Amino acid sequence: MEHSTWHRKIKESLPPDYFARINQFLDQVYSQGRVYPKREHIFKALTETPYEDLKVLILGQDPYHGPGQAQGLSFSVPDSIAAPPSLQNILKELSEDIGKRDHHDLTSWAKQGVLLLNACLTVPEHQANAHAGLIWEPFTDAVIQLANAKESPVVFILWGGFARKKKAFITNPKHLVIESAHPSPLSAYRGFFGSRPFSKCNAFLKENQLEPIDWLQ
């Protein structure tokens, strides 16, 4: 990410020592035990979806905390790994909305301009949200604010109460916010199923003369 537009813009909006503090934090936690994703994949969302290509932002909370799952993209796992419950429900809603997708790896979405961002970018094994509130939120809030500052229209997909709190950062009237309950089994039946975020997103992109996302790719 170091030479990307994201890095340059984020650096401008955070304190001068912030990236040094991130590196200190990472040195510490990765030396203490198993942390996900692999260190080289922490910023994968930003490297796979350059600022210039951003069309959609899907916000997650923190990485999957089981072995082999997290790959630096919110909600995504490698195809060789069983889909976690939230991803199962995302694919179920996609199937009802647009069509069936067999892949669990969402990298192809990222390459089309879908920023798959977690608010917290690291997690210790089997300890969900353990790194929340420690270092990452100023960084990922800056990413959301930079997405909001884009001149071209962006679709923000916010699932669940945690993500919806970030709506306060989305003030540009050019953008579209799609919000619903979280795809987790605990809440999917309270407004996620039937919300049709994928077709709504593509309709908005087409209205704005932007290439729609091939969600089935």
Swiss-Prot record:
One of its GO terms (biological process) is base-excision repair, AP site formation via deaminated base removal. Its EC number is 3.2.2.27. PROSITE patterns: U_DNA_GLYCOSYLASE. Excises uracil residues from the DNA which can arise as a result of misincorporation of dUMP residues by DNA polymerase or due to deamination of cytosine. This is Uracil-DNA glycosylase. It is found in: Cytoplasm. It catalyses: Hydrolyzes single-stranded DNA or mismatched double-stranded DNA and polynucleotides, releasing free uracil. SMART domains: UDG, UreE_C.
